[in-house]
Amino acid sequence: MYIPEHFAESRLDELHRIMRAHPLAMLCTSGPQGLDANHLPFLLDADSGPHGRLIGHVARANPLWQSVAPDSEVLVVFRGADGYVSPNWYPSKHETHRAVPTWNYEVVHAHGTLTIHDDVKHVRSVVARLTHAHEAGEPHPWKMGDAPPDYLADMLRAIVGIEVHIT
């Protein structure tokens, strides 16, 4: 992605802040059928590796987990805040009329390698961590133990864990 130098952000803590604030990201992969994009919630594990690690899951019915080669390079795109900027907002527009519209946005492109985890124990851990993170702000957070055990077991068998080691 082209980023003008004066807009580039390289502070890892700021990149991680955006990723945490906007966890629904687009996982871009390339497989035998060509390019693919999946919109998935991710949890950032900032302490894993020099740049962190992303964990999540996909439906077992999603061909992603079988079509992408092990340790494939992937791109995960986190979209933050964005908005239109009118030329009318610039004082110079009223003086010189030398202004044009633009769009301001924040986005993080996390490059990494994809690992698939077809293991119920791993998937249970991923779901527990995602649930804990996303239910934390709820007045009465849902817990995995709130679901009937047989139903939860069926749901866990229907998903596959994914992990992206950010490079």
Question: Which stretches of residues belong to each language-model region?
Answer:
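Binding-site signature for planar aromatic cofactors or substrates
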Residues: M1-T167
